[in-house]
From Swiss-Prot:
GO terms for cellular component: cytosolic large ribosomal subunit. It holds the Pfam family Ribosomal_L1. Signal peptide: none annotated. NCBIfam families: rplA_bact (TIGR01169). Gene3D superfamilies: 3.30.190.20, 3.40.50.790. Belongs to the universal ribosomal protein uL1 family. This is Large ribosomal subunit protein uL1. Binds directly to 23S rRNA. The L1 stalk is quite mobile in the ribosome, and is involved in E site tRNA release. GO terms for molecular function: rRNA binding; structural constituent of ribosome; tRNA binding.
Amino acid sequence: MAKQPKRITAWTGDRDAAHSVEAAIALVKANAKAKFDETIEISVNLGVDPRHADQQVRGVVNLPSGTGRDVRVAVFAKDAKAAEATAAGAEHVGADDLYEKIAGGFMDFDRVIATPDMMALVGRLGKVLGPRGLMPNPKVGTVTPNVAQAVKDAKGGAVEFRVEKAGIVHAGIGKASFTDEALAINVKALIEALNRSKPSGAKGVFIKRVGLSSTMGPGFKVDISSIGA
């Protein structure tokens, strides 16, 4: 049998037991040994079947401790709204000109925001933005006349979440360099947002399992009673 890489054999902590959120965070951080500031990621198994329209889960949460990411924002807007977006810190602002850039392959951004009147234009980029999860949507606040606030939210810790086919939500909730307390606050904020987004068709236990991991490290189970789930 081939030897496991040293990075794997060096992992510490019980991966089978369910830990309090504080203990799980400490274990994840202790195993985040890459030479870069690893993202701390959460996975939440939900008691839903996303194949049914009344069991979809989608929303946005403003993480109190931020994300630790430098979020690059593109905004489709004109005139005064374009000026507001630029003043709020958006990296790329435009209308037809921005459409042409993206249609030509430009993708140097992490979030797309649009004013409602721009959606007819933005909709033509569906095949480009949709598969990447970048299509603006009013349900998560990225189609809005208040582009300045949307830009500030995106850069200040707003994280979109959406249930995947297997009934799982994945999200980044900070960096390994964050304090344990800051990460715990973000975890609890996301869980609260998920509970608020519980669909009408969900029956039985909604939040079934929660796990935490880092970009390059192992995952650890979280005792859901420790996060009020």
